[in-house]
Every structure is written in structure tokens, then in C-alpha cells.
Amino acid sequence: MPDEVILTPHPGEMSRLTRLPINEIQSDPLQIARFYSNKWKKVVVLKDAHTVIASPSGDVFINDVANPALASAGTGDVLGGIIGGLVAQSVPLLSAAVLGVYIHSRSASNVSKNVGVSGLLASDLLSEIPVVMEKLRNS
């Protein structure tokens, strides 16, 4: 695996990567993300209601903007695209992960105000992402 990698598993994927039971991952996602980020020497974005972002240096961030709409199919791919786009603009990996998770969750919150959390499609996020990014640039 290349050195410059951001992993973005949800608990089920993290279970397959680590061979830990899903309930163990969900019971302490902060410590699990921190441990495996250090072990693998990779940035880990452990997606769940409160997404945990961990770096190999031990820094850990928690996104407290929980949105059940992000549990729908394809939203993780949108997150990967946001993070990848930031990395392509030379944003450092950890910063790209933290910022990407924030942009993703804020976009979902904004969209779900109009369509609700149960009707959100991953593609609904696409028009809101540049709006959130522009607000960040201007703040």
C-alpha cells in the first residue's frame, strides 16, 4: 500500500480489515481508529454517526454533525470524492480528511432540511458541496 493513503471504512468494512467484531468497533471507535491509524501508518476516517478521523501521529478528530441520511448508498463514495479532490489540490492528507468529513456532513445537513433524512440520495449532495465550500472560503 502506498504511504500517502486515507482509508474511509464504515464499521462493517473496518471489521473486515481488522477482523474485529462490528460491535467492538462501534463500542470504542475513537480508540479503534487511533490504534489502526498508528499500526497502519495511514489516516483513518472511521465513518459512523459520529465519524472519527485519526492520524498516525495520534491526532484524533470527531465530527459531531451526525446525520442519518449519510447512511444511504453512495454517500461514502461522495465523501471519498471530496477528500480526493482536496488532496488533488495539495491539501495535506489529515487536513483533507477532516475538511472533507465536515463538508460532507454539512452538505447532508443542508440538503436534508429540504428533502428529509429518509429521502436523501448521494447525488443530492453534489449541488450543495460547492455551496458549503464557498461559505468556508468566505468565513
Residue ranges of model-derived segments:
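Short, small-residue alpha-helix embedded
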Residues: 16, 72-103
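Short capping/connector residues at structural and topological boundaries
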Residues: 19-22, 65-68, 75, 116, ...
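Short beta-alpha connecting loops at secondary-structure transitions
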Residues: 17-18, 64-70, 80, 84, ...
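Short, charged, surface-exposed loops that flank catalytic or proteolytic processing sites
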Residues: 23-28, 90-95, 116-120
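Short, well-structured alpha-helical segments that form the helix of a local strand-helix-strand
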Residues: 29-37, 93-107, 122-130
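Charged C-terminal helix
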Residues: 108-139
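Glycine-rich phosphate/dinucleotide-binding loop and adjoining beta-alpha-beta core of small-molecule
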Residues: 1-65, 138
